[in-house]
């Protein structure tokens, strides 16, 4: 796919190169570089959403696992960071919903 280089930052273009290496060459170093580049930012975004350090760490790892599993589907219409943060956000929202459902079902069990 052709990329309009003027519409992306240098960092985004570097991400595209790392993604190509990860997907096409199965380059583990490329995966590691992407994770190193975004892990803290993803973690702190999730931490703001749930305010639990252990859960935030777990959800950060889950977000990267989902992103890397589907990296071959990534389209270069947007930056990798936008795509990754959307995955992390959706995964965290799912976690919050499941947690609320468990709390509600426990409350219902106790009142029955």
Language model: regions and residue ranges:
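Amphipathic, Lys/Arg- and hydrophobic-enriched alpha-helical face
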Residues: 35-53, 70
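Arg/Lys-rich amphipathic alpha helix in sigma70-family domain 2
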Residues: 73-75, 86-106
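A short, glycine- and basic residue-enriched loop/turn
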Residues: 28, 53, 57, 71-77, ...
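Sigma70-family region 2
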Residues: 24, 64-79, 98-100
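Internal acidic/polar
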Residues: 11-16, 102-112
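Residue-level preference for hydrophobic side chains embedded in well-ordered alpha helices
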Residues: 34, 38, 42, 63, ...
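N-terminal module of bacterial RNA polymerase sigma factors
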Residues: 1-40
């Amino acid at each position: 796919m052709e990329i309009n280089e003027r519409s992306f930052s240098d960092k985004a273009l570097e991400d595209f190169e790392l993604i190509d290496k990860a997907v096409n060459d199965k380059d583990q170093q490329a995966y590691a570089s992407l994770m190193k580049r975004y892990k803290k930012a993803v973690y702190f975004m999730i931490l703001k959403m749930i305010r639990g350090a252990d859960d935030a760490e777990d959800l950060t790892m889950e977000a990267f696992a989902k992103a890397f599993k589907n990296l071959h589907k990534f389209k270069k219409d947007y930056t990798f960071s936008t795509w990754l943060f959307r995955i992390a956000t959706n995964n965290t929202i799912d976690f919050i919903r499941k947690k609320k459902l468990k709390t509600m079902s426990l409350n219902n069990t106790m009142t029955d």
